[in-house]
Amino acid sequence: MKFPIYLDYAATTPVEFEVMKEMMNYLTLEGEFGNPASRSHKFGWKAEEAVDIARNQIAELIHADSREIIFTSGATESNNLAIKGIAEFYKKKGNHIITCSTEHKATLDTCRYLENKGFDITYLNPLQNGTINIYELQEKIQKNTILVSIMHVNNEIGVIQDIHKISKICQSNNILFHVDAAQSIGKININLKQLKIDLMSFSAHKIYGPKGIGGLYIRRKPRVRLSAQIHGGGHEKGMRSGTLPVHQIVGMGIAYKIAKIKINSDFNYIKHLRNRLWNGIKNIEEIHLNSNFENTVPHILNVSFNYVEGESLIMALKNLAVSSGSACTSSSLEASYVLRSLGLKDELAHSSIRFSLGRFTTKEEIDYTIQLIHQSINRLRNLSPLWEMFKSGVDMNNVNWTHN
């Protein structure tokens, strides 16, 4: 085994060897390093051809038309382009947008930005299992609602939203529907020919492709319009200017091609490992499962260990690469806003650990992780006066704490 063991695949993934190998062919003088916008010579033609092939590979994974794929720098930019772009283009039609309080910061902060610009944003609170209340969504729709933006799979707890039902509600009310699919693409099957989704954000680095490249699906029929957020040479049909990074796009295409082949085998393999991990730790006293197995991807297992501080546990698990929440917010010492939205008390939210598994995780790594968790929890709790009080029968909910 190689240490530390990587169990943070929801943050990013290692690049597949085949992806890296193909990317190298588009970087140096010996390869096809041209600008795809250079249409007057072979270097540009070859680069453009490579981009077209990758665009098709991406479209095939999600069953879309390749002309509906726009390249961006990643899912964060795609979310910004989708939400701001729709808000600006359709502002004469309405200024109301609906999203969920457990969305990724790329969506929440974009919506807060629009609030400061005069837009009306409704933040749905999730049910206890993390899904949105479909009936509440219907109730919150107004005459001036122009967009609903909901993530497919939550990045902290792995819950899967019913985007099929949501899309039907949006379609029946003539409202555009945007989906953040950064955590679902390549993990569960998505067929955009069957789903009435208007915009979908995704990236490469969550499914064994390079960082710094992503995409936005924009439906052609019926046509969805949006305002560009980056202006310049009019690349990507005028929706996202900037010279295309051919090597990254090629890498993304290969990663999506591999994902199409391995999606089902990956799912079953990772589910087996997730179950092995949970079965190995579920009998630990005062452990709380924050990921509902019935409606989540197996790639993410979020648990809380009561009377153990999450940051302390992460330091104790120094041979494991895990996180206490989203990689984008794990530097904050505040309790996870996602877990608090589910109704968890701060104590449990603070003691949460996200284990995220991937294609290269092994059974031996899971078994080592189980052993290390048991040892670390026992050691930390033996040092905790709160654990001692709990074991002595003190009702912790009735303790009157004095704050200095």
From Swiss-Prot:
InterPro entries membership: Aminotrans_V_dom, Aminotrans_V_PyrdxlP_BS, Cys_deSase_IscS, Cysteine_dSase, PyrdxlP-dep_Trfase, PyrdxlP-dep_Trfase_major, PyrdxlP-dep_Trfase_small
Reactions this protein catalyses: (sulfur carrier)-H + L-cysteine = (sulfur carrier)-SH + L-alanine
Purpose: Master enzyme that delivers sulfur to a number of partners involved in Fe-S cluster assembly, tRNA modification or cofactor biosynthesis. Catalyzes the removal of elemental sulfur atoms from cysteine to produce alanine. Functions as a sulfur delivery protein for Fe-S cluster synthesis onto IscU, an Fe-S scaffold assembly protein, as well as other S acceptor proteins.
Gene3D superfamilies associated with the record: Aspartate Aminotransferase, domain 1, Type I PLP-dependent aspartate aminotransferase-like (Major domain)
SUPFAM superfamilies: PLP-dependent transferases
Domain of life: Bacteria
EC number(s) reported in the record: 2.8.1.7
Principal subcellular localisation of the protein: cytoplasm
Family: Belongs to the class-V pyridoxal-phosphate-dependent aminotransferase family. NifS/IscS subfamily.
Keyword field: 2Fe-2S, Cytoplasm, Iron, Iron-sulfur, Metal-binding, Pyridoxal phosphate, Transferase
GO molecular function, one term: pyridoxal phosphate binding
Name of the encoding gene: iscS
Positions carrying N6-(pyridoxal phosphate)lysine: K206
Residues bound to pyridoxal 5'-phosphate: A75, T76, N155, Q183, S203, A204, H205, T243
GO cellular component labels: L-cysteine desulfurase complex
Active site: C328 (cysteine persulfide intermediate)
Subunit field text: Homodimer. Forms a heterotetramer with IscU, interacts with other sulfur acceptors.
Example GO BP: [2Fe-2S] cluster assembly
Subcellular location: Cytoplasm
Binding site for [2Fe-2S] cluster: C328
Pathway where this protein functions: Cofactor biosynthesis; iron-sulfur cluster biosynthesis
Cofactor section: pyridoxal 5'-phosphate
Descriptive protein name: Cysteine desulfurase IscS
